[in-house]
Each structure stands twice: as C-alpha cells, then as structure tokens.
Amino acid sequence: MNRRFPVWAPQAAQVTLVVGQGRAELPLTRDENGWWALQQPWDGGPDLVDYGYLVDGKGPFADPRSLRQPRGVHELGREFDPARYAWGDDGWRGRDLTGAVIYELHVGTFTPEGTLDSAIRRLDHLVRLGVDAVELLPVNAFNGTHGWGYDGVLWYAVHEPYGGPEAYQRFVDACHARGLAVVQDVVYNHLGPSGNHLPDFGPYLGSGAANTWGDALNLDGPLSDEVRRYIIDNAVYWLRDMHADGLRLDAVHALRDARALHLLEELAARVDELAGELGRPLTLIAESDLNDPKLIRSRAAHGYGLDAQWDDDVHHAVHANVTGETVGYYADFGGLGALVKVFQRGWFHDGTWSSFRERHHGRPLDPDIPFRRLVAFAQDHDQVGNRAVGDRMSAQVGEGSLAAAAALVLLGPFTPMLFMGEEWGARTPWQFFTSHPEPELGEATARGRIAEFARMGWDPAVVPDPQDPATFARSHLDWSEPEREPHAGLLAFYTDLIALRRELPVDAPAREVDADEARGVFAFSRGPLRVTVALRPGPVGVPEHGGLVLAYGEVRAGAAGLHLDGPGAAIVRLE
C-alpha cells in the first residue's frame, strides 16, 4: 500500500490528492514519466482512508487503480491492503486448467443474495458435482447495482454489492480449501459507458479506435506503454495478490494492437514469469471468434503463448444438432457432419466459407496442438444470455437431449465448461440485465439488443427490458430444482459423466468418429470408452463390448444386442 498515492496523468498540468474524512487537498508532484505523487508518504494514521484526485480542477475522481469503491464508481475510492488478509491456502499448489472441468458462474445470480459470501455456501455442491475450477464472470466495479460485469470501469476494484475485495479473498480461499481452482474473467478490450473517468487522467483510450462495445484501449498509440502496464499489472493483481489461478480474457479479437509485440504475447510472457515466482501454474484462456491458432501457439513458434481458447464451433455444432435450430450463425452447423469435423479437427470453420459472416473464416488448428487447449461447452453466459429471451437449452429440449449434449462435451477431447445450473437442467432463464442509472443509456441498450436479434431471426417483441428489475430477478438460479425430479436425475448423470471423464487420458483424441444423419446418431471412442449419442426419438443400437458403464435413457437388451431409446446417451467400456 503506497501512501504517496501515485497516479499516472501525463497530460495534466496539476493533480491534487483529496484524502481523508475531512477531504484534505494535497498537491502532488510530477515525475518525468507522467506519474504524480506526494513527495513524502502521507501520515494520516493506520486507518484505511478514502481518497481520489482532482485533475486540472476537475473531479474528484477515483484512482484508476482503486482496489475498493464502497460507494460506487463516481465516488472516492478507499485504501485496501490485500496483504492484510490471513490466507489459509498455503498448501494450495494450483493445477493446469487445460483438460480440467470448468464451471462458469455469475456472482449476482448464482444465489438469491448475489454475493461472494453466499456463493461460498454453494461450493460443496460443485465439489460433489466433481468440477475442478470455478470461472467467475467479471467482478470489477461498474456503475449500477447489477449487470453481467462486462461494462466495468475500475478494473482493480471488486464490485461492492458482491462484497468487495475482502469477500473475494474469502471466496478464493474457500475454493482452494475444497480443491477448486479459480478463473477470473477480465475485460481488457473496452471500458463501460457509464462512470469511466480514466480519460480524465490520460490517453487510456485509442484515438478513433472502437469496437462493438465502445472505445478500444490505447495499446499502440502515443503514451500507450503505461496503458499496457495498467492491463498487465491488473492481471498480476488477480493472480498474485488475490490468488486466482487463471484469467479468461474477454473477446481478445477486439483488442486493437498493431505493435510487433502484441499485448497478448507480452501478457503471456509476464504470467509465465509470475508462475515461476509463485511456484504454481497459472492459466490464460482467451475468448476469441477468430479460429486462429496463433493465440495458443507457443512463443517459440511465433505465437502468443496463451494456454487455451474458447471454441464456439463446438457449441454451435452441439446446439444445432441437439435443438435443431439453424438460424443465424447456426446455419452452417445443422448436420452431424459439423460434429464430426469439430471432434476430428477442433474447429468447423478453419478457412471455410461462413454463411453468417459472408466470407471465409478461420484457419486450421496446428496438428501439434492438443484439443484440451480448446474450451468447449453446450451452454455459456453468452450463448444463453444473448438469446432473445435468455432461454436455456432446457427450454427447447427434454432431459434426454440435455444428457446427450452433456456426454458430447464432458467426454469429448476438449476442456469442458458448464454454465451454472446446466448440470440439473435449470428452467430459470439467464437474461441480459442492466442497472444503468442514466435512463437514456438504459434505453439505448434496449434498442441495441433489439437490433442485434433481428439478424438471428428472433422476434424483437419478446426481448425483455434489460433495465427492468424483474429481468434480473428472473435470472437467479432456483436451488430447489436439483432436489426434485427430473432435475435430480440429470444432476446425477452429470456427476457420473465427470467421474467417468477422470478415467480418460487428458490428451486422448476422439477415435472412430461416426455419424448416422438419417437416424440422428453420433458416436466416438476415447480411451477405454465408446460413447453413443442418440439425438432423436427411437431405438439406437449400442455396441456391448466390455459392458454398459453409464446411460441416460432406457437401455434394453435384445437378441441383436443393446438398444438405447433416444434421445439420450450410452457409454460402454471397450474390451
């Protein structure tokens, strides 16, 4: 904790510290790199104090590196010393998260209370399920009380309604005590539209550089060295000071960086260095829609050296074949051939024509890159929440089809990820919700959602108002569901699938991948198992081999062998 209160404001003529209960105003001194600070540490006693800055008479604004915002992003921040927490995870050695089972959750809707402390009380459910890691949607501070978290404006501060930074430390500690790793979702491609005062301090945003969500960060323009340092230091903060085990990097395709050394490569090198310093593995997972192996190619082979990246193509192939939905970006994925290709080659679009994009897309995955470096899922926050009404797959198909999707993801060759509630077939939607204090911003957000859905062929009239508190309320999990059927049976199947997955060598490829389009049957072998998935009603033959290990759906023995009544899944052990 630095009580000289340094802040970067390279273009300011004057910066004044506003500090303490009496809001004393103390002038700061500038160094040659544009950093302002007190010449001597402030001696205001041991208590943590509120502080902010006047920049050329404007403000006061919160510190861009503020670690706590107890009264919101427009107010003064409060000192926070992460070293004061008495960690109990000295025995935690971390784990390689490629090949692990990841569970994605949103703090605000995971429990009725919507806090990190209340989430701790549900961690034992995840342990019984058998997952290896919890991935938290962004927890950085944003304007308003509730939202998805992707409009953060103070990236170092934990959103106060979730419990603030101390609650975050308690959550990570509780996860590690149960053998669960923690992946933190971070957003470095834009800043939120409300409460963003970073441009008042300096050129954090790129000139004329914008993406889907707003102004892009200044990664390659004048004075961009400190902007990049701001991002890399933030990653280090979550991993070192808050003990996270990995980061999910949001929409890296939206990063605008023309430097020879790309930010992602620089970040990966620093995180590798940090892993050596900490003596535990750290994982960087990119979200990217580029289907570009450069992200996860080694730096020695002129890649960025990230550990894994999301694979939307697996989702699209699973979703289209399980639900039969082929509108919008699902159009190319409607046949079982799409499933065959992603199981054999990792991506469907690897230089092929994309009808949704109306151009060729992607490039082939390097043959030496194992599929565990691709994160696959049947549902996630984007693919559920960005539907017109935020309906889960459970609103479109029955439990047998949900079980089929689960078998594809959890026993496939990828790193599997589940979305909270998926494991019991939650019937609660997960919708897009916001709490922008500015009415005009809320209205603009709603209009943007309606325009976005038009291209997918969904009825804009049914899109819920993101600003309506009922939209947020509907999106909370119902924890009574897994205690009753049919949810309890599906939960047991997920649990058994995850246990079965542990028998498989992590890099075992999918072999003998077969598909029968007419009958809606997809099958593959991995390790000692043969997986048969029936996507349509009716009996499907299942090879007996060494005997049935697990099934969802009735399996009958007859003269011709085993038959599974679809939809469902059956797994047998190979002789």
From Swiss-Prot:
Q: What class of enzyme is it?
A: hydrolase
Cite the Pfam families for this sequence.
Alpha-amylase (PF00128)
Q: Which Gene3D superfamilies match?
A: E-set domains of sugar-utilizing enzymes, Glycosidases, Immunoglobulins
Q: Which UniProt keywords apply?
A: Carbohydrate metabolism, Cytoplasm, Glycosidase, Hydrolase
Q: Which InterPro entries match?
A: Glyco_hydro_13_cat_dom (IPR006047), Glycoside_hydrolase_SF (IPR017853), Ig-like_fold (IPR013783), Ig_E-set (IPR014756), Trehalose_TreZ (IPR012768), Trehalose_TreZ_E-set_sf (IPR044901)
At which residues is there a site annotated Transition state stabilizer? Answer: D382
EC number(s)?
A: 3.2.1.141
One GO biological process term: trehalose biosynthetic process
Please verify whether the record's keywords include Hydrolase.
Answer: yes
Annotated residues for binding of substrate: 248-253, 312-316, 381-386
The protein's annotated pathway = Glycan biosynthesis; trehalose biosynthesis
> Where does the UniProt annotation locate this protein?
Cytoplasm
Q: Which GO terms describe its cellular component?
A: cytoplasm
Q: Does the keyword Protein biosynthesis apply?
A: no
Q: Active site located where?
A: D250, E287
The protein's annotated catalytic reaction(s) are:
hydrolysis of (1->4)-alpha-D-glucosidic linkage in 4-alpha-D-[(1->4)-alpha-D-glucanosyl]n trehalose to yield trehalose and (1->4)-alpha-D-glucan
> GO MF annotations for this entry?
4-alpha-D-(1->4)-alpha-D-glucanotrehalose trehalohydrolase activity
Primary subcellular site in the record, as a coarse category: cytoplasm
Q: Which NCBIfam families match?
A: trehalose_TreZ (TIGR02402)
Family membership: Belongs to the glycosyl hydrolase 13 family.
Record-given protein name: Malto-oligosyltrehalose trehalohydrolase
Q: Which organism is it from?
A: Arthrobacter ramosus
